[in-house]
Design a protein with these regions (language model features):
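Short, solvent-exposed loop/turn segments that connect beta-strands within catalytic domains
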Residues: 90-94
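Extended acidic/polar, glycine-enriched regions
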Residues: 25-29, 39
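Beta-strand secondary-structure signal
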Residues: 1, 35, 97-101
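Short amphipathic alpha-helices in soluble, non-transmembrane regions
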Residues: 6-22, 112-121
Length: 178
């Protein structure tokens, strides 16, 4: 919430900010819009000082691709996603829940980026917890399963298959652990 005394200053600042964002992403995000309106005080809110620290922590939190594969050109190796920020309430009161996910073809790199995220969010959050996610899985170009699959493709289509690796949450790492 912004005090009414600052409403016009905020409107001018926000309109300038919107114009900047539109100039940066307008060709890609054609439906982007931001809107400022006067409303009643919400039931759930974050005190101003806590909100400032939360915004700083979110700004410091890594998001996106953090490393490319050194063995497979063009393949993202490690990434992190700042997925959602939600206001919630329980018996203790209002709190903010932040969900992130990390992926990597190298398990140790996944844990490293998870620690970076935790360090950034710990600046503002009373508690930071992690789910397990998918284990790291490095593509294996010499995999026996890949050879069987390539041969089956060649037999069916009389053509060499195009084999690529992708960066995604894959069950392959789960299968590999078994």
């Amino acid at each position: 919430a912004i005090p009414m005394a600052y409403k016009e200053d905020i409107r001018v600042m926000l309109n300038h900010y919107i114009a900047t964002i539109e100039a940066e992403i307008g060709d890609v995000e054609k439906d982007f819009f931001m809107h400022l309106e006067t409303t009643d005080m919400p039931e759930l809110f974050i005190p101003a000082e806590k909100a400032k620290v939360l915004i700083q922590a979110l700004y410091a939190c890594p998001h996106g691709m953090t490393a490319m594969s050194k063995t497979m050109p063009g393949l993202v190796e490690t990434s992190t996603n700042l997925a959602s920020v939600k206001m919630k309430e329980d018996e203790k009161g209002a709190f903010v829940e932040i969900n992130t996910s990390q992926r990597s073809s190298i398990e140790s790199k996944k844990h490293d980026i998870k620690q970076m995220v935790e360090c950034a969010l710990a600046l503002a959050c009373d508690e930071v917890t992690h789910g397990d996610g998918y284990p790291g899985w490095a593509p294996n170009p010499q995999s026996p399963l890949l050879e069987v699959t390539k041969k089956a493709y060649q037999d069916l289509f009389a053509a060499e298959p195009k084999v690529l690796a992708i960066h995604a949450g894959l069950e392959c790492g789960l299968f590999l652990e078994k």
